[in-house]
Amino acid sequence: MDTQKQKRSAFSGKIGFVLSAAGASVGLGNIWRFPYLAAKYGGGIFLLVYIVLAATFGYTMIVAETALGRMTHKSPVGAFGAFGKKGGLRFGGWINAVIPILIVPYYSVIGGWVIRYLSEYISGHGSELSQDGYFSNFISSGLSAEVCFLIFTVFTLAIIFAGVRNGVERVSKVMMPVLVVLSVVIAGYSVTRPGALEGVKYFLVPNVANFSWMTVVTAMGQMFYSLSIAMGILVTFGSYMKKDVSIEESTETVELFATAIAIMAGLMIIPAVFSFSGGDPDTLQAGPALMFITIPKVFESMGFGHVVGILFFLLVLFAAVTSSIALTESAVSTFEDELGWSRERATALIGLIMVALGSLSALGYGPLAGVTMFGMQFLDFFDFLTNSVMMPIAAIAICLLVSRVIGVQKIEEEVTLDGKPFRRKKIFNFMIQYLCPIFAAIILISSVANALGWIAM
């Protein structure tokens, strides 16, 4: 193991880890998914529940996964395997490793959609995006959706080929500051539109009347995306972290950064929707279509909407790229560690998997629309399988590994290697042993029961 540790790639320091891990978190999950869920499930009350959960459940899982990666210098399969070869441990490692392999193909399809929208705004055809039927016609076109998906995929793989420092870290150091600046600019523009203050109030001020059990379940599910929990990413990135870098300080920074960007995304989109529709309930309930159908209509109704459209979809593209890089890196690392493959060979295999599975999702609304998985289109199925089933199971596996196999004390020792005290140790200990596995089980049971029609969510 010592030889492997010496040869393993590493981030240059805290900044490299923070920006790369934040890049993994600040993706479509925050820019695309968080705002439409906040709009749909109560605005301010959803935000409050999310922040409380992120500061407890989310924080605990980030620390646990990062520490696990650093103490073993392994990606998920090797990290679990370092503590035994029993079937349960192998299962826990592989489910954490397989998740990013299944997510990044359909994630890249959505990234391709973003490329299409950005290119339309840049070419001066942004007004076409606001027309009824544009989005459905595009995703059902087959060839256009496939080409955009392939462009996004090739760009991601090119960065992965370059390695951890020259690829992942370098791109994150450039894209993340730009993403922050664009977020502030667009949010500032959005909240100053006529009627937008009602949207700000809806998003930031909790209203208990909007609270429901679904608010909690949805906020818990969103955390997996917003903080990159249970995807194998944080274990992998933790394995690249140097021993003199503070885990607690680094993970707190990632947590705060990701949450701040999620809030900024809400301020970009929800006030703009209120300005456009006056807070029409149907518009707020638009769900996943909010960014690709409603937002172009909002921009079309604005002065300088063309410029805002370019900036907005450029921001979304940056966010999508940083997350797809992290997902792909986690997958590539698994093959490097477990099969002893070169980075080039592992990246080539992941590229083939991305093209094969991603093409199913890209063509799933067009030529393959008649083929479904359990009544769902391919993209919807892969999203349900990973987010609602596999991630909760992976989170439970992490909790059991830390609390029942490794021992919480070992994780505490890893966290304090930099010589600083573990300030939130009591919260971590209680959450990892009791509440985190319970929360993950609630998400799993609720999601599966809803899919089977036993409950309505």
Enumerate the language-model features and the residues they cover.
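Membrane-interface "cap" regions at the ends of multi-pass membrane proteins
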Residues: 1-32, 61-66, 70-83, 87-94, ...
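Membrane-embedded translocation segments of transport machinery
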Residues: 2-7, 11, 169, 173-321, ...
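Helix-loop-helix connectors at the membrane interface of multi-pass transporters/channels
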Residues: 2-4, 78, 111-140, 240-244, ...
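Inter-helical loop and helix-membrane interface segments of multi-pass membrane transporters/permeases
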Residues: 5-8, 36-41, 76-95, 108-165, ...
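Select transmembrane alpha-helical segments in multipass membrane proteins
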Residues: 10-21, 45-49, 87-101, 147-152, ...
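Transmembrane helix-boundary motif of multi-pass solute transporters/channels
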Residues: 13-53, 238, 249-252, 256-259, ...
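Extracellular loop-to-transmembrane helix junctions
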Residues: 38-64, 144, 390-394
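A generic transmembrane alpha-helix motif of multi-pass inner-membrane proteins
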Residues: 379-400, 421-457
